[in-house]
Amino acid sequence: WSSAASDVYKRQDFDSLVENKSGLGTAGIVVINKDQDIIKCFARIARFYKHESCGQCTPCREGSGWMWRILERMAKGEASREEVEMLFDVTKQIEGHTICAFGEGSAWPVQGLLRNFKKEIIKRNNFDPLIKSNKDIPYLVDQHLLEKDNAQNKS
């Protein structure tokens, strides 16, 4: 897993979590051990949000369904790079555009998955790690990850 797992040992107050691009939300915490499939766990969370959306506002009603479907494909290793890029865009279309905070709450876990578990997403979906630049997949792949993968492939 990424360094996200070690973040649990950091301070768990609202301000400290915001500094780490995280948050307490409703102060509910989900603990997932390393034996679990992290992508499937996030797909399950997305399914909850899709199911529980009241359907009143379009970004939440449609966006939660989109996120769930893409995460299901991602968990099976069937997602394309374009879908994963679109997934981040969908979260940004939901965030700040819903009647209540439920829609935003559905977007934030997905953003966390994309931010903290990129390597798992790339490996599961057989994305080419030897991409020439960040412009090829701007959000999903960080330059340091590309350099690390390139170094491993040379040895």
Task: For the regions a language model picked out, list residue spans one by one.
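Single conserved hydrophobic/aromatic residue that forms the stacking wall/gate
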Residues: W1-A5, Y9
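Ferredoxin-type iron-sulfur electron-transfer modules in oxidoreductases and energy-metabolism complexes
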Residues: K10-S155
